[in-house]
């Protein structure tokens, strides 16, 4: 999902907004109601936009090795703060489902970075998409302890919701003051290698990817064109991969300034085709328990993907048979609870802490999941991220305290 905590976190400067109401948010999912949500992406959809206002763009490649139990992601974050300061960051995580100490995390600032259409370059790093828009190569040695060199190849079509996959904030869609956008390659073959080590913890991982084995990747390209705690108060993200199916959920709920509006995008595919792109999904948190920092963290999650088949035309949507798939799993393996406030500069922390109820945490899980479709069950692995950002939109006087 959009890792707004990493790299571009300074974009959170600002205080809470007035209570605008639902008419000030224009979800991409609403524009496809009564239509076929699934649109095939083009290469142009994955071009870096690099606007001159506050934004964070991320290019994230999740990988899942069904044979060894390894998962993780490699990511580049490109952020622009108020149109004045642009930064870029490489982040990487690898994690083993059974040997939970067998994990490595790194985050490194990038130098001399540049954008060329769909491609991104920096010292000792490159992300390059081929002209046909079927493959992406990711290479990085920016961290001397982490070597990444893999290529993903699309197994199914790329996905966007509607012709324009952006959700807009503001009273005028043609001149919005904020936006959120996601485009996906939900299921990809992956080949190459990852070599990572952490001498302090005595962890060394050498992972070889091959298209002939049960190795899969999910690629999401995202842009958040506004301050994160204004855009959303919570997120739910799921990347499920099995030998036969992929299911992806990207869901966020706005703060009450935008009427607690939920926008959810679901994708279900098999090994060769997109089965459905769904925009009426239900992510159920089962047995939530308030933890030591005050958030209701579920012990299990069940996601119902509800929509229509991907091959239904707009004119036939009303009479189309419903599509339904359920993906569920216990959240037993907490990879990390990321304390967002511990990661940001003091000045920004003072501002954000002045927004009452703002205590952002990201919970990352990796567990066994099961997908059910037409009475057929498929077991696989799921990477799930649950993010809590804020409970309120009220502002305290301390929001203005820069000390």
From Swiss-Prot:
GO terms for molecular function: ceramide binding. InterPro entries: Ceramide-binding_SVF1 (IPR051385), Svf1-like_C (IPR033394), Svf1-like_N (IPR013931). Residues 1-18 are annotated as: Peripherally associates with membranes. One of its GO terms (biological process) is ER to Golgi ceramide transport. It is a peripheral membrane protein. It comes from the Eukaryota. It is found in: Golgi apparatus, cis-Golgi network membrane; Endoplasmic reticulum membrane; Cytoplasm; Nucleus. GO terms for cellular component: cis-Golgi network membrane; cytoplasm; endoplasmic reticulum membrane; nucleus. Keywords: Cytoplasm, Endoplasmic reticulum, Golgi apparatus, Lipid transport, Membrane, Nucleus, Transport. Belongs to the SVF1 family. Ceramide-binding protein that may transfer ceramides from the endoplasmic reticulum membrane to the cis-Golgi network membrane, and is thereby required for the biosynthesis of complex sphingolipids. This is Ceramide-binding protein SVF1.
């Amino acid at each position: 999902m959009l890792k707004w905590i990493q790299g571009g976190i300074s974009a959170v400067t600002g205080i809470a907004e007035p209570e605008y109401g639902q008419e000030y948010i224009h979800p991409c999912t609403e524009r496809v109601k009564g239509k076929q949500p699934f649109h095939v992406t083009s290469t142009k959809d994955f071009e870096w936009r690099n606007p001159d206002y506050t934004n964070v763009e991320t290019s994230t490649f999740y990988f899942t090795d069904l044979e060894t139990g390894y998962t993780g992601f490699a990511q580049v974050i490109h952020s622009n703060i108020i149109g004045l300061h642009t930064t870029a960051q490489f982040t990487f995580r690898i994690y083993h489902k059974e040997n939970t100490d067998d994990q490595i995390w790194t985050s490194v600032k990038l130098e001399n970075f540049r954008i060329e259409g769909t491609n991104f370059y920096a010292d000792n790093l490159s992300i390059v998409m081929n002209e046909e828009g079927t493959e992406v190569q990711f290479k990085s040695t920016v961290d001397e302890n982490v070597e990444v060199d893999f290529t993903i190849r699309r197994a199914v079509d790329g996905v966007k919701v509607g012709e324009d996959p952006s959700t807009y904030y503001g009273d005028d869609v043609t001149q919005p003051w904020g936006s959120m956008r996601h485009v996906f390659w939900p299921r990809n073959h992956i080949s190459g290698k990852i070599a990572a080590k952490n001498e302090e913890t005595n962890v060394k991982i050498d992972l070889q990817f091959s298209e002939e084995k049960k190795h899969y990747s999910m690629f999401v390209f995202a842009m958040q064109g506004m301050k994160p705690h204004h855009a959303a108060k919570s997120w739910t993200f799921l990347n499920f991969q099995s030998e036969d199916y992929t299911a992806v959920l990207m869901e966020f709920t706005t703060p009450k300034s935008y009427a607690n509006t939920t926008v959810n995008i679901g994708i279900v595919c098999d090994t060769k085709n997109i089965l459905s792109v769904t925009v009426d999904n239900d992510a159920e948190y089962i047995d939530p328990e308030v933890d030591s920092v005050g958030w209701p963290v579920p012990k299990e999650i069940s996601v119902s993907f509800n929509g229509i088949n991907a091959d239904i035309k707009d004119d036939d949507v009303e009479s189309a048979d419903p599509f339904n798939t359920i993906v569920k799993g216990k959240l037993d393996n907490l990879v990390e609870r990321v304390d967002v406030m511990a990661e940001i500069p003091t000045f920004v922390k003072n501002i954000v802490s002045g927004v009452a109820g703002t205590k952002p945490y990201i919970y990352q899980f990796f567990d066994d999941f099961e997908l059910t479709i037409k009475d057929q069950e498929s077991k696989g692995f799921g990477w799930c991220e649950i993010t809590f950002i804020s409970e309120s939109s009220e502002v305290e006087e301390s929001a203005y305290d820069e000390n």
